[in-house]
């Protein structure tokens, strides 16, 4: 037979466990996991060398690219994050107004991708496209989004930013 004391114990114990879990999970030590990676870091200079031509995959990847400079730990660094994306290869088709290489579903993904680029540009991200790559994949320079700076050879940009201290993340 259950008494009031028997009913009280399981509820209070459960409440205690939930409180402890909440405190532990809300603790900064458990929140990020970036303590080792950002130890001593004062600035965030990142260059993403992007060649991925699949629109759906590009959207998934760009969520992570965008999130990388939006996390609180990066935003709280002494210097504002500097992010550059250089487009090469098949990725150049994703930044063109010519959607003929894509079916309807892919075209919708391209529109979403281009909207993300516009938003990231407003957030201060710089974009460059390799015009040699555009020529190789058959993209007319005139169809490239106006938010994206044109460079003759994207490798020169990648090397230049790397020499300036940017971390290079290659996304094939």
Question: How should these model regions be labeled?
Answer:
Residues 1-10:
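N-terminal secretory signal peptides that target proteins for export/translocation
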Residues 7, 28-31:
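Short stretches within intrinsically disordered, low-complexity N-terminal or propeptide regions
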Residues 12-26:
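Bacterial N-terminal signal peptides
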Residues 30-172:
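Secreted/extracellular ectodomain signature
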């Amino acid at each position: 037979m259950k008494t009031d004391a028997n009913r009280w114990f399981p509820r209070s114990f459960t409440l205690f466990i939930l409180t402890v879990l909440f405190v532990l999970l809300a603790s900064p030590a458990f929140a990020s996991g970036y303590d080792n990676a950002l130890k001593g870091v004062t600035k965030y200079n990142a260059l993403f060398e992007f060649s991925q031509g699949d629109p759906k995959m590009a959207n998934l990847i760009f969520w992570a690219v965008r999130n990388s400079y939006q996390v609180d730990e990066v935003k709280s660094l002494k210097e504002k994050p500097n992010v550059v994306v250089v487009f090469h290869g098949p990725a150049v088709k994703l930044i063109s107004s010519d959607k003929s290489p894509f079916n309807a579903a892919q075209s919708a993904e391209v529109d979403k991708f281009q909207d993300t680029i516009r938003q990231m540009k407003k957030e201060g991200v710089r974009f460059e496209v390799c015009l040699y790559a555009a020529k190789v994949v058959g993209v007319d320079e005139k169809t490239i989004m106006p938010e994206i700076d044109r460079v003759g050879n994207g490798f020169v940009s990648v090397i230049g930013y790397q020499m300036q201290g940017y971390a290079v993340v290659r996304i094939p």
